[in-house]
């Protein structure tokens, strides 16, 4: 038996998971009986929570080869998807809806969709809250709560934009539920993170021709400040998480048109940081060329000539260098 040491304290009437100092000892058999038998790859069923640019593009991509159920709370969007009318502006989604035989259905009933899913892709909105100075992640946790209620064996993959460290923090948050709730006894918390790198109105295209695929799974991090998270991952994480990450990456590769896609597997926190710093750099690049354009205007210079001269340096390049009103969209302002 492998033994996980967990410390639980009552703080202000609530039980808190506080670390690895024992008084509670949970034993898990080493033959891994808590793993569930996922369907064969070709028969995998997938649910996608959210039908914005991220969710609908992923649902469309995966439904080329698998049964996919898209979940949303807006009846009009669900109706449009089922009639193969895209509720968002995206040329390739519209094209695939019109021309492809997609195994895609949409529903308002998340409970039913998640109950029979092998993978649940979470693409719920995470709007930035200026009052709390933080991402509003409650929609993600609402989905997780429902999945754990109806199908705790499902592998959940967060695709939403989230702060660095968020996915690991969920292992700590949900540790007590898995250790104490009878209905979760013997189950494991199957949660991954896979950042998206999509452009609005080109979301499906960017999934068909991805620059890279990254999937993060739970890994240990050295340092005493990570003891609680590490203990939670040891207690409720699944040793098969890396294999599930590889399966999810294979799903994305299967749906893509591009061959030989660079695919990376790393810790969840590192995967979150990739998304953050990629978007921060893109926002910085837009701001840089806008500042250059402003300087040129004040000094009476030809901005395009300067930009062309700079861009011919291969370390800088000629892409993403058009001065404009600034950067926007759903992700760049949140990440920068």
Each predicted region: which residue ranges?
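Structural/interface elements that position substrates and couple domains in central-metabolism enzymes
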Residues: 34-336
């Amino acid at each position: 038996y492998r033994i996980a040491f967990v410390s639980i304290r009552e703080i202000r009437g609530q039980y808190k998971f506080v670390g690895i100092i024992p008084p509670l000892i949970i034993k898990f058999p080493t033959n891994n009986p808590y793993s569930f038998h996922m369907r064969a790859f070709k028969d995998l069923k997938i649910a996608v929570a959210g039908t914005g640019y991220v969710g609908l593009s992923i649902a469309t991509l995966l439904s080329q080869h698998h049964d996919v159920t898209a979940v949303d709370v807006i009846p009009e969007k669900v109706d449009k998807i089922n009639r193969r009318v895209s509720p968002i502006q995206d040329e390739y989604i519209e094209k695939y809806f019109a021309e492809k035989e997609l195994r895609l259905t949409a529903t308002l009933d998340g409970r039913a969709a998640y109950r029979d899913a092998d993978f649940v892709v979470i693409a719920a909105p995470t709007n930035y809250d200026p009052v709390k100075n933080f991402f509003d992640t409650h929609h993600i946790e609402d989905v997780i709560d429902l999945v754990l209620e109806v199908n705790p064996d499902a592998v959940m993959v967060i695709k939403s934009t989230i702060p660095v460290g968020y996915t690991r923090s969920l292992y700590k948050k949900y540790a007590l539920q898995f250790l104490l709730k009878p209905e979760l006894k013997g189950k494991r918390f199957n949660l991954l993170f896979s950042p998206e790198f999509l452009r609005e109105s080109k979301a499906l295209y960017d999934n068909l021709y991805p620059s890279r695929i990254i999937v993060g799974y739970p890994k240990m991090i050295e340092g005493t400040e990570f003891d609680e998270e590490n203990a939670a991952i040891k207690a409720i994480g699944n040793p098969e998480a890396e294999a599930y990450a590889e399966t999810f990456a294979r799903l994305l590769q299967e749906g893509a048109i591009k061959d030989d896609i660079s695919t990376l597997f790393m810790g969840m926190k590192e995967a979150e940081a990739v998304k953050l710093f990629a978007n921060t750099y893109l926002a910085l690049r837009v701001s840089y060329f806008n500042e250059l354009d402003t300087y040129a205007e004040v000094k009476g210079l030809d901005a395009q000539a300067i930009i062309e001269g700079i861009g011919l340096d291969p370390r800088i390049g000629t892409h993403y260098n058009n001065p404009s009103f600034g950067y926007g969209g759903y992700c760049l302002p949140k990440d920068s």
